[in-house]
Swiss-Prot record:
This is UDP-N-acetylglucosamine--N-acetylmuramyl-(pentapeptide) pyrophosphoryl-undecaprenol N-acetylglucosamine transferase. One of its GO terms (cellular component) is plasma membrane. Pathway: Cell wall biogenesis; peptidoglycan biosynthesis. Cell wall formation. Catalyzes the transfer of a GlcNAc subunit on undecaprenyl-pyrophosphoryl-MurNAc-pentapeptide (lipid intermediate I) to form undecaprenyl-pyrophosphoryl-MurNAc-(pentapeptide)GlcNAc (lipid intermediate II). Its EC number is 2.4.1.227. Keywords: Cell cycle, Cell division, Cell inner membrane, Cell membrane, Cell shape, Cell wall biogenesis/degradation, Glycosyltransferase, Membrane, Peptidoglycan synthesis, Transferase. Its main location: membrane. It is a peripheral membrane protein. It comes from Shewanella sp. (strain MR-4). CDD domains: GT28_MurG (cd03785). It is found in: Cell inner membrane. One of its GO terms (biological process) is regulation of cell shape. The gene is murG. It catalyses: di-trans,octa-cis-undecaprenyl diphospho-N-acetyl-alpha-D-muramoyl-L-alanyl-D-glutamyl-meso-2,6-diaminopimeloyl-D-alanyl-D-alanine + UDP-N-acetyl-alpha-D-glucosamine = di-trans,octa-cis-undecaprenyl diphospho-[N-acetyl-alpha-D-glucosaminyl-(1->4)]-N-acetyl-alpha-D-muramoyl-L-alanyl-D-glutamyl-meso-2,6-diaminopimeloyl-D-alanyl-D-alanine + UDP + H(+).
């Protein structure tokens, strides 16, 4: 049976952790002949990113309410009702066969609107602890999907992993290059960087380079380039360090690296598993419900990563972990293999197939 002419409304926004997995599914279905339309908010990253991939996007007016002041909380119910009506208008005009919610502010009103319109609703939760929107919508969704085991306790959910780009899955299948003398450390703090990495790494590299040859590729985040470069120079370490505001080609960065120092966002954890790289994970301490620590446990329990809470992170602890890996390349390689073993490599196809099945049921 052909799926040509089927329509899907994708709801995802706010962060790359929501948008990029949704784009992977959208691209897959578009290649099967599906019409894809997006629901998001005009002031978040999906407004810029989604059109670059060739998908039309509609906007609704909705913001988060957690942690906001009393006035905004009192006004929130009225804004939610308005945004549901906006989403319902999009659904009435586009007439999707299925709606896929993958997190972000637009998913809540869009999910309710789908239910009111009688359109099948699929949810996908990327994190080990579900966000508030998906927790609420899970009770009305036709199918709930998640990346990690034991994410949902109140509803039955199917574990499918996180959809990631095919290029990264292919990279993980490539034979690993023999490590040279210099330990290659990729430092990634997200698009905004991570202040703790920016503050500590120049001193870490200076201390480690006295005992071990090391090269570093450090993504420092927006507006941090000059300051971090200067800090490396002051430590006499600018020669073996590539400092970038943002790394556009993560495939190249992963291919280059021996080990990754990073946060533990759901997409990052899934990508590390897919490409088969060992890591040192420092969960973002202010993440809602500390979900990054739970995300990290997947790799830590597999023996593929070290977990260093930011509260105890210092130069000595980072030097110690990196020195350990530099001196035991066999363990470094085994950690990478363990990471690949926990990867779910067909998550994109699994999410898409659930959408296809529900659309065909009508």
């Amino acid at each position: 049976m052909t799926d040509a002419g089927k329509r899907i409304l994708v709801m995802a926004g706010g962060t790359g952790g929501h948008v990029f997995p949704a784009l992977a599914v959208a691209k897959y279905l578009a290649q099967q002949g599906w019409q894809v339309r997006w629901l998001g908010t005009a002031d978040r990253m999906e407004a810029r990113l989604v059109p670059q991939y060739g998908f039309d996007i509609d906007f609704i007016d909705i913001k988060g309410v957690r942690g906001n002041g009393l006035v905004r909380k009192l006004a929130a119910p009225f804004k939610v009702v308005r945004s549901i009506l906006q989403a319902k208008a999009v659904i009435a005009e586009f007439k999707p066969d299925v709606v896929l919610g993958m997190g972000g502010f637009a998913s809540g009103p869009g999910g309710v609107a789908a239910k009111l319109a009688g359109v099948p609703l699929v949810l996908h939760e990327q994190n080990a602890i579900p966000g508030m929107t998906n927790k609420l919508l899970s009770r009305i969704a036709n199918q709930v999907l998640c990346a990690f085991k034991n994410t949902f306790t109140q509803v039955k959910a199917k574990v499918v992993g996180n959809p990631i780009r095919r290029e990264l899955i292919a990279l993980g299948a490539e034979p690993k290059q023999a490590a040279d003398d210099a330990l290659k450390v990729l430092v990634v703090g997200g698009s905004l960087g991570a202040k703790v990495f920016n503050d500590l790494m120049p001193e870490v590299v200076a201390a480690l380079s006295k005992q071990q040859s090391i090269t570093v590729w450090h993504q420092v985040g927006k507006d941090n380039l000059t300051g971090v470069k200067s800090a490396y120079q002051q430590q006499g370490q600018d020669g073996g360090v590539n400092v970038a505001e943002f790394i556009d080609d993560m495939e190249a960065a992963y291919r280059w690296a021996d080990v990754v120092l990073c946060r533990a966002g759901a997409l990052t954890v899934s990508e590390l598993a897919a490409v088969g790289l060992p890591s040192i994970l420092v969960p973002y301490p202010h993440a809602v419900d500390d979900h990054q620590t739970r995300n990290a446990q997947v790799l830590v329990e597999a023996g593929a990563a070290f977990l260093l809470p930011q509260a105890i992170l210092d130069v000595n602890k980072l030097v110690s972990k990196l020195q350990l890996l530099a001196n035991d390349r066999a363990e470094l390689a085994q950690m990478g293999q363990r990471a690949r073993e926990v990867a779910v490599l067909d998550a994109t196809e699994q999410v898409a197939q659930v959408c296809i099945a529900l659309a065909e049921k009508g």
